[in-house]
Structure formats: C-alpha cells, structure tokens
Regions:
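Accessory, non-ATPase domains that flank or precede helicase/AAA+ motor cores in DNA-metabolism machines
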Residues: 1-304
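ASCE P-loop NTPase motor cores of helicases and related translocases
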Residues: 226, 231, 239, 243-247, ...
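Loop/turn-to-beta-strand initiation segments
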Residues: 364, 409-412, 437-441, 689
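Short basic/glycine-enriched coil/helix segment immediately N-terminal to the Walker B
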Residues: 400-411, 431-437, 541, 654
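Walker B catalytic acidic pair
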Residues: 417, 444
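C-terminal accessory regions
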Residues: 596-597, 609-725
Length: 725
C-alpha cells in the first residue's frame, strides 16, 4: 500500500543498482537514519539529494521509499556541505580537511561566495583558483538542475532527460522550453514529436503554434524515413499531418498546407513531381539523386579488357556454375557490378574466386560489410581480411577520413550484405570511391529484408539492371537441407522436421502445435531448460538466438528477454534475478547477453553487435565483451542506454549475423507482421539448425504471405529505363 507523497533529504551512502532511468540504494538522513529507496532517478554514491515520493511495502525488500523526483540538495548545513565537497565524485582536489575549512568559513553563505567571489574560497581552502573554478561549475550546474527539475518533473521528464537539457541550455532551459517546447525535437536526440507534444499540452501550448505545426509536418516526413521511405506524397503528407496535429479548426488542412509550402520555400523540405507531387528531406533527396547519377554513368561505361580472363576463370574457378562465372567476370571488367542470390546459391564461392584471380593479377582487393558480424563471417569464409563499411571509410564518430578528396585505395572493393545498406551509407561509400581506379562489386540477397534505414538500394538496382547484374538462381548441390528448406520458403513452402540427422541434431525442426501464446512461451523456456544444451549440445548464450517479429506482448522481445534472463541466470550462474518493476528497463548482470542498439563510435561498437557482460558492479558499471574487444560502460551514460538484452531479438536487428541455432517464433498473434521475406531472413540466420516454434497456421501464413516491400525511393524512378535515356 502506498502512503502520502513525502520528501526526504540525505546523503547516498550505498548504491545497489543504478542506470539512466532507475536506481536503488540507501540514504543517510541528517538525523543519522538509514532509508532504502528505489525509483525513476539516477544517483551516485555520496550524492546529497532530496527525494520526493511515497513509502511503499515491497513484497521482497520490505518497507522502502519509492522515489519519483530527485533534486541535488544544496541547502546544506556545514556538516552536509563538508561531506558534499569531500565526497562528490566529480569534485577533484578537495579532500575532507579542505572541505571542512570551506564549510566552517562560509557555511550558509557558500552559494554567494562560490558564485561571486570564488577567489576567496580558493584562499580559504589553499587550493588553485582552477580547482575552485571546477567546483564552481559543478555547484552552479547542480543549482541549474534543481531549478529545471522542479519545473520540468511535472511534465514527465526524467532525471536523465533534465540532465541532458541542462547541459544544452543551462540556466535558460525552463524559459526556452516554455517559449517553444518543440525546440527539443531540433536540439536533443531521442525527443520525437509525440513525446514533446505531450509536454507541450501540459504546458498549455496552443495547438496552432507555428512551431508545433512545422514540427508536426517534419515529424511526418521523418517518420517515413523511419519506415524506410525516402519521400511522402504531398497530399498524403497533408492528411498525415492533419491527423497528427488535431487542430480542431475547419481550415486546419489549409493552415497546414501554408506551413508546408513555407518549409519547402525555405529549403527545409523539398518537393518534386514524379508520378505525383512528393515531399522529402533534402539530404536524402540529394543523396539518392547523386547515387542515381553514379549508377547511370557507370552503366554507360563499357567493360575493360582483362588479359586471359577465360583461362584465369578456368584455373581459379573450375567449379563455378555459368551464373557464378558471369558474376566473377563482371566483377573483373566493370566499374560497378551486382551479384545477388539466396542461401546456398554460391555467392561466397564466387567472391573467393574474385579474390583469387585478383591476387594472380596483383590487384588489391578490399572486403567490407555493414556490420562487424557480417564482416567477420565474410573474412572467415573467404579467408581474406574484411572490415565494416564505417571502418573502411575511416569514420571516427564525427567525420569520415575517406571521401572524394581521399578515396579508398583498392583495385576491387567487394561489399557484402548490400540488402542492409541504406541510402546514407551507400552515398558515403560511393563518395569515397574513384570508379576510374576502383571496381565495386555489390553482393547480397534481394529476398532478405530491406535495410532498417531509408531506401531499398539492392532491390532498386536489381529491378533497374542499370549496372551489370547476376542473379544466382541455382542452389548448389552441397548446400544441404537447411539452405534448401530456407529457400523453399520463398515459394511459400514450409517443409516439415528434417529426416536427416547429424549426431543428436537435425538441421530443421518445426514445432507447430501450440495455438496459445503462453504454451509457445513455456515450450521456448523448456527448450532452454532441458533440450538445447543437454540433448543438442549447444552453448545457450553463444550458440542460440531467439528471433521474433515484435517487441511487445508475451512473445515479443521485451518479455521474452526478461523471462530468458531470469531462467539462464539461475541455470548457468545460480543467481535469482530480482523482479523488474513495471515500466522499467531490466538491469544487467554478469553473464548477460546484450546487443548494441545504436552505433557508438567512441567505444567502437556498432549497431547490432552482440556482447556478453563480463562484470556488473552494484552501481551499474558494466564491462562488456564484443567479439574479443572489452569495453567499459559507465552507469547512466549514453553508452548504457544503447544496450539491451539480446536473448531474444527482432529479425531486423540481427540481419547480417549468423548463429549455430536460430529459434524462430511465428505465431498467429503476429500475423499482421508476417510475410515470407521476414521468415526467410530469420531462418537464414542459422548455420546448423533452425527451430520454427509456434502454431501451424501462424508459421504457414508467414510463408504464404507475399509482401512486396515497395518503398518510396527516388532511385526506383531515377533508374527506370526512360530516366536513363
């Protein structure tokens, strides 16, 4: 039962767990009492804080304070001030003795002294003015935070979000947001229109505020990019914005159109007449237009001769099929060529042959892929060093070392997993290639899911044939049951559990007798509890990956990750994971499997990289191993917010990765997301075994449902034959 809202003050003397959105610890009050607390706040040991919230009785941890608001308590008596100065983790050069001198001399006048006469504080403490300058910055920042938090907590902003805003706007944060809350969308990553609009409504911002209408229009365009589209039809954009903004006026659509025309006139958005009038982000429009010009120009160039090419193909590629031979030949004689094919069609062997012939010709070959996992797999199977595209371009998190003025130095550049390459990355890549000196070979599987980002590069190129294109259609004899059954999905067929068996394992399992979602969930947990390791010999963390189409619901990634974390921590480490409060992110513990959700160039960890927590401290600091590289993640940092549990992942998130065993959840409750390219992409993540788990109708419907993923792209128009003429 919850009590009335109260406020408590004190010093944090212990932190049990801490993250950007949740902390638990122990507070020592000015009277010397100890209080256990937990809530949506971020604290560190020795912080002087004021917590607001309610007393609750937890079923496991007993009576504790549920914190809903945190302020840095700077209204300190001399004892508290000395403790704050001596123990604050960011204050350097002031130990207990110097802190006591400052507290005894200034007491309640410290705020005025540190703001207006910091030299006097330096003189009393006998420390350099630079040290007091750093202290002054921390003190004022905490004051600014308190001022901002006291105003903004009522609007639902968290401690972590307010900290970010104070760092951006300082003491003007409240005035800035009250004047125009939509500035959050422009200045702070992660603040989308809907979140900001909720804040604006609480502030009483009028619905017809110009910045709101403009922000809503831009949000609709950016939402299209998030869906993979590069443009929105003009009339459709007006309808979307009108539905989003709900302005409650008869002429709302006309008002929105006036603001849209203004955004176009200012160059904030761009419009173009295709089959219909469309609107787009100008950067994406420019990138696709320039890419189209690059591909068209390349397509106009004829082949260049390679001496004794047929003989080289006979020697190095004696086992090539005619299709593969054509792809290898194209790679060696054209400035841009494309090879695409499904699982088991022989793309890897063709790439290996390209590398072998290039070595004979003393040509420098570079291999790259969108993700670290895909690059490592390419390197392992081809036997030639490979890197991520970002590393190839020399990206340091801010700038690219390779561009048109400093192009990539290679004779042949092979890019694998091109289905994952979105328009911005493709544009960056071709900006860094001199096609008069370097041939680019694009390799992928056009039946896989398109990229997470905007565009549909691989399919647009396959459809247009603007560059020499080879589609490998023949499944090679050595492909095996797993790849044959995976390819059958493209024809709408789900084959039953395989008869063939290697040791205790089969390459293909279909478990389709569960119509109830909870039964599917129980079966999944049973596989981890009793089958995968004990009977099939798999490492439960490193060999097995659960794939599911959704994030929400009993069979979504969020709930499955919590359940699998609890099961595997108990099974493998004997650790009982505490309950995860509703609405909170689960904490990480040593042994957890995690995935990076956004690129982190400072740590050198890319989106989609799977890692393992080596160590997790009580304060929330993590040591994580990614493919042999160990990184340190501080609690409450942006790096920490980019990590998620990875026992279960969406299919898109692991595109380009492979695992010995993939468990693919396909249930009728997900039917609105089902289509055969999704299922095909999921099963082709497996190297040895696939386990299809769900109900028969759900699995078969997923394979039967054809979804033409026609994205709105400029390339699809610009590369049409008439556009190339």
């Amino acid at each position: 039962m919850k009590d009335q809202r109260e406020s408590i003050r004190g010093i944090v003397d212990a932190v049990f767990c801490s993250g950007p959105t949740f902390s638990a610890g122990r507070l020592v009050t000015p009277e010397g009492g100890e209080v256990k607390f937990a809530g949506k706040v971020y604290v560190r040991e020795h912080d002087a804080v004021r917590l607001e919230g309610r007393w609750v009785t937890h079923s496991k941890y007993g009576r504790q304070f549920e914190a809903e608001f945190l302020g840095h308590d700077l209204e300190l008596d001399p004892e508290g001030l000395a403790n704050f100065l001596a123990n604050h983790p960011d204050i350097k050069g002031i130990g207990p003795a110097k802190a006591r001198l400052i507290a005894d001399r200034f007491g309640g006048d410290f705020d005025a002294a540190i703001r207006n006469d910091p030299e006097s504080v330096a003189a009393v403490a006998k420390v350099p003015v630079e040290t007091i300058g750093e202290l002054r910055g921390i003190w004022i920042a905490n004051r600014d935070f308190n001022h901002a938090m006291s105003h903004l907590a009522a609007y639902g902003l968290t401690h972590h979000q307010v900290t970010t805003l104070v760092g951006k706007f300082g003491s003007q944060v409240v005035a800035t947001l009250e004047r125009d809350p939509y500035v959050l969308m422009r200045e702070i990553p992660g603040f989308g229109f809907k979140r900001v609009d909720k804040i604006a409504r609480k502030m009483g911002t009028p619905k017809d505020l110009a910045s709101r209408i403009r922000a809503g229009i831009q949000y609709c365009v950016l939402s299209a990019l998030d869906d993979g589209d590069c443009w929105v039809e003009y009339e459709d954009l007006l309808d979307r914005a009108n539905t989003l903004l709900v302005m409650d006026t008869l002429d709302s659509r006309e008002v929105i159109e006036r603001h849209l025309e203004a955004l176009i006139a200012e160059g904030v958005l761009v419009s173009q007449a295709l089959e219909r009038l469309i609107v787009a982000d100008p950067e994406i429009h420019r990138m696709e237009t320039e890419l189209a010009a690059i591909f068209r120009e390349s397509g106009r160039r004829g082949p260049h001769a390679v001496a004794d090419l047929d003989a080289l193909l006979d020697v190095e590629g004696g086992e090539l099929t005619p299709e593969q031979r054509g792809a290898v030949s194209n790679a060696l004689i054209f400035s841009i060529s494309l090879m695409t094919g499904g699982a088991g069609s022989g793309k890897t062997y063709a790439v290996s042959t390209i590398v072998s012939i290039a070595d004979r010709l003393e040509r420098k070959v570079l291999l790259a892929a969108p993700t670290g996992k895909a690059a490592k797999r390419l390197e392992d199977v081809v036997g030639h060093e490979a890197s991520t595209i970002h590393r190839l371009l020399g990206f340091n998190g801010h700038t690219y070392a390779r561009d048109s003025m400093n192009p990539i130095e290679a004779d042949i550049l092979v890019i694998d997993e091109v289905s994952m390459v979105d328009v911005p990355l493709a544009w960056r890549l071709f900006q860094a290639v001199d096609l008069t000196k370097t041939a680019v070979v694009l390799v992928g599987d056009h039946n896989q899911l398109p990229p997470v980002g905007p565009g549909n590069l691989l399919r647009d190129l396959v459809k247009s044939r603007v560059v020499p294109t080879t589609i490998l259609t023949r499944i090679i004899r050595q492909a095996g049951v797993l790849k044959e059954n995976s390819t059958a999905i493209l024809a709408g067929e789900v084959r039953p559990t395989a008869d063939v068996q290697e040791g205790a394992r089969r390459p293909w399992y279909v478990i389709d007798r569960f119509s109830d979602r909870e039964d599917v969930r129980r079966m999944l947990l049973l596989l981890f509890e009793e089958v995968l390791q004990e009977r099939l010999g798999y490492d439960l963390l490193r060999d097995v990956q659960v794939l599911t189409p959704t994030h929400k619901g009993p069979l979504g990634t969020a709930e499955l990750n919590i359940a699998l974390q609890r099961l595997l921590q108990k099974k493998l480490r004997g650790f009982d994971v505490p309950d995860v409060p509703s609405g909170h992110r689960p904490a990480f513990y040593a042994g957890d499997k995690v995935i990076q959700t956004r690129n982190d160039y400072e740590l050198g960890v890319m989106n989609g990289a799977v890692g393992y927590v080596v160590e997790a401290t009580a304060k929330g600091a993590l040591t994580v191993e990614f493919d042999g590289a160990v990184v340190e993640v501080e609690p409450g940092s942006d790096a920490a917010s980019r990590l998620q549990l990875a026992y279960a992942c969406s299919v898109h998130k692991v595109q380009g990765s492979e695992f010995p065993c993939a468990i693919v959840v396909a249930h009728k409750s997900h039917s609105f997301m089902h289509h055969r390219n999704l299922l095909y992409t999921a099963v082709t993540r497996a190297q040895e075994s696939v386990i299809l788990l769900g109900d028969r109708w759900g699995i078969e419907n997923c394979a039967a449902k054809r979804q033409v993923d026609r994205r709105n792209t400029f390339l699809s128009f610009l590369l049409e034959p008439e556009a190339r003429a």
